[in-house]
């Protein structure tokens, strides 16, 4: 009785969502802005999962593992709601570093990479590194990268604390979607690129493609609760105690005069 750990095995996919939290994701060409729309879509994705594992990497100039690989979707939704630019101290958009971190964040044997995908959500404005080289390495490992471009080619200004971000000349900075690199990353790894629209961020299309992939065996350790059985043990103990009194009543002359178990 009580609880114990129980290992469950199921077929599924490991998905590492890699989310851009740089200032450019605050652009308002999506309502209320790119990042808030992304967070909402991720939360809806987690609500519909059953046997897959998920993790979260957030990035700007540097990446950070926000949520290690897990099958606890309630916890995953809670972490998704907390996605914010303040999670990363260095601004910029280093997509290559983020993909590298996502590859390292998968669980278990890195040599067995089928059934593992990275979903990269960004506006594609890569400033700091060579994301293509990391994509080529992911392809060699058998990890597919699905990319979602959020933003518009025309772009939009960004606000922080109600103030528009401006360049050194005092002009408002406009963040535009860079699709070329995102499409190339997906193509190199055998994934797919989707451009977000006002109606859908694109996760539904990505998940449909992922569901057609070869799955892998995933082990999950869970706490298993049992019904308390102490009442039955208590009854058995009382029966044994009564039997002991019967024996004592018959054999012990000091108890015989009490006549507890004798008819008068």
Model-inferred region functions:
Residues 16, 57, 119, 146-148, ...:
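Hydrophobic/aromatic beta-strand patches that form the interior of the parallel beta-sheet core
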Residues 46-53, 80-87, 102-110, 122-128, ...:
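Sec/Tat-exported extracytoplasmic proteins
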Residues 26-28, 64-67, 126-131, 155-158, ...:
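Extracytoplasmic/secreted cell-surface and envelope-processing proteins
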Residues 1-8, 212-264:
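C-terminal signal-anchor/stop-transfer transmembrane helix together with its immediate cytosolic
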Residues 1-116:
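Membrane-embedded segments
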Residues 89-93, 104, 114-117, 122-188:
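VWA/integrin I-like adhesion module and closely mimicked acidic/polar interface patches used
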Residues 72-75, 163-166, 211-214:
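Short, hinge-like loop/turn segments at secondary-structure boundaries
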Residues 182-213:
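Extended, hydrophilic extramembrane loops/domains of integral membrane proteins
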């Amino acid at each position: 009785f009580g609880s114990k750990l129980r290992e469950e095995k199921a077929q599924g996919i490991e998905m590492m969502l890699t989310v851009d939290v740089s200032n450019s994701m605050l652009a308002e060409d999506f309502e209320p802005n790119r990042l808030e729309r992304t967070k909402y879509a991720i939360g809806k994705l987690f609500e519909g999962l059953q046997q897959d594992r998920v993790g979260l990497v957030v990035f700007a100039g540097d990446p950070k593992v926000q949520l290690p690989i897990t099958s606890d979707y309630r916890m995953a939704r809670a972490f998704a709601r907390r996605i914010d630019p303040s999670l990363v101290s260095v601004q910029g958009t280093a997509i290559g570093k983020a993909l590298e971190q996502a590859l390292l964040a998968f669980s278990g044997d890195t040599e067995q990479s089928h059934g593992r995908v990275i979903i990269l959500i960004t506006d594609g404005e890569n400033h700091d590194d060579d994301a293509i080289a990391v994509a080529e390495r992911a392809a060699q490992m058998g990890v597919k990268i699905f990319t979602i471009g959020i933003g518009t080619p025309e772009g939009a200004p960004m606000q922080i604390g109600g103030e528009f971000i401006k360049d050194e000349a005092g002009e408002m900075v406009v963040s535009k979607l860079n699709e070329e690199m995102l499409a190339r990353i997906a193509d190199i790894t055998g994934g797919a690129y989707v451009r977000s629209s006002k109606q859908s961020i694109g996760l539904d299309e990505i998940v449909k493609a992922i569901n057609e992939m070869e799955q892998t065996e995933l082990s999950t350790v869970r706490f298993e609760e049992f019904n308390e059985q102490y009442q039955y043990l208590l009854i058995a103990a009382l029966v044994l105690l009564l039997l002991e009194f019967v024996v004592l009543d018959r054999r012990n002359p000091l108890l015989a005069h009490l006549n507890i178990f004798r008819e008068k």
